[in-house]
């Protein structure tokens, strides 16, 4: 079972009574056929549920009102099978608070050249019915997605499925609770921000809990539960000699297991699906949570270090969006650069907390090594390299008057040399279009040093995310040129300033 099983998407057909009962009967018949086929063959993440035809203002308004109040409804897919006068949609769309996609399709793929007549023309009017609907969306400044293509086309299936992921993610985000263990890392700017504005814009709430509250739960974990979790570690990872039975760091592994079990219990009891820690506020914990955080991220929790609640929330959102897709998604930080003419590279990592979902196939190494930052006992962590291939890094920042999403398209590469003294998981990548352009654009746009790294999602997914939440997006990819990028930032200042 996945999060998508908790939701459904309503399929709504727009028409009108002008064409008579027989035409409406055929429209209904076509709709049933299309919905059944999409549910069976399109590999959509959510089930489509066909609703009654929308043929009058009252019917359409009722559907939109019901969608708002049905917690299982993640959004609406609308198909204008015939011409559906768009003034009928104004009241419904004005109250709709769920994501909306217009599927610009028709029942037949090819025109029946020899038999086409006016009955056929009146029945299959998406070509101009869809434009009428599009006008009222533009007139009302109604944000909605549009997918054009035949309902049997695999590309259309893929695009509808991607939108469904956004719709479900948006509903999940409205219920998301972010727990900050301790506060922000002292004097750090980008990890701070307006939590009230974030809840208004995205729906997630952010609150702080004292580390002592967590420690109380951690200390209540029994030895039997710890031993059972250690058994899971033994089967899942390659343990270094120091962490094996009778190793001199075995007790550190047991303490890491205790922290993991305590953290998970605390998060479950509070209904939290994202959290932060900071190494400046660990009072009562024997070590910085490393292994615990890595494993919780792999289970779908959002996380970021140093109290960075925006990145923690974004990671959870992107985890939901990517559920069931190939590739992983993790908290990440641009840590250090490799400057070599024609082969500039970025080494991404964090002190400990990189999600194993992005790891290469072989078992991660479980080790305990010294960590100077934080002043605690040596923490346990998983060490691994990252899968290669196309990926993205994304950052959500608070500009005071709005949110900006930055996305850099990257290409992860194999580490050319072993890293025998680096005791943390890492990812190595080439930034698009090149490191100087990418880093300068990122810095000029105010991008954070913390990011969400993903092999599973791509730029199109993040564009949809920005659109569905009505926030600014700044893209850095192979098409980026700094003068044009700077111009776009200036234009966005004007656009969003006027939009306020």
From Swiss-Prot:
Keywords carried by this UniProt record: Arabinose catabolism, Carbohydrate metabolism, Isomerase, Manganese, Metal-binding
Task: List the catalytic activities from the record.
Answer: beta-L-arabinopyranose = L-ribulose
GO CC terms of this entry: cytosol
Name what cofactor the protein needs: Mn(2+)
- In which domain of life is the source organism classified? Bacteria
Gene Ontology biological process: L-arabinose catabolic process to xylulose 5-phosphate
SUPFAM superfamilies the UniProt entry points to: FucI/AraA C-terminal domain-like (SSF50443), FucI/AraA N-terminal and middle domains (SSF53743)
Residues binding Mn(2+) are: 306, 333, 350, 450
Pathway the protein acts in:
Carbohydrate degradation; L-arabinose degradation via L-ribulose; D-xylulose 5-phosphate from L-arabinose (bacterial route): step 1/3
Q: What class of enzyme is it?
A: isomerase
EC number from the UniProt entry? 5.3.1.4
NCBIfam families the record matches: PRK02929.1
Family assignment?
A: Belongs to the arabinose isomerase family.
Describe its assembly: Homohexamer.
Q: What does this protein do?
A: Catalyzes the conversion of L-arabinose to L-ribulose.
In Swiss-Prot or TrEMBL terms, this protein is called L-arabinose isomerase
Species the sequence originates in: Salmonella typhi
